[in-house]
Amino acid sequence: MLRNFAVGQLLVPPWDAQASGETADWPRGLFDLAAEHGTDVITAEDGTVYPLGSGTLTVLQGGESELYDTDDSSAHVNNASLCTLFEASNFRYLSTGDAESAAEQRLVDRYGKALHATLFKAGHHGSSTSSTEALLQVVQPQAVAISCGLNNDYGHPHARALQRLTDAGAEIYRTDTMGTITFTWQNDTLSAASADTLDAAA
């Protein structure tokens, strides 16, 4: 993104290498690249609201050290994901990054039905450990976008996650089968188009 697009600001979660179990300060390369391209790096804080286009982006949670408390080392970093809600003209878009079930449950406990969203970006590329039933019950998404590569080594999206999304009644859009997907919100109607398929109403 930074190499190919003009990015004014980069929003990142607080990073605690010791709490996360990581031995290296992995964000340093990213920060150096941001500086090289003149991109401002902003450390997110829960509850902060940023103006974005005609709407606002709210940081719901991300990076709290207590979310690192897990036996799965890979989940340490995943649970540091920023969870954000974009709102504009009756449209709501929820993104939870790679957050695992523990971080999702914290969201549910803190915000409940205020997490309702028109469009939800499936957690962790459609992993079985994200997009839990508890979260979907409060989000009640009209449509879900899954970002994952074709025939990826991780098996994303997982069949269990797909079943939960289907049971939630959401239209499912996948980059592995559809390529780049563009969502449009107009006249209170969400539509989706991809490089490989015709426009489809969600």
Label every PLM stretch briefly.
Residues 1-202:
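Non-globular, low-confidence helical/coil segments that flank catalytic cores
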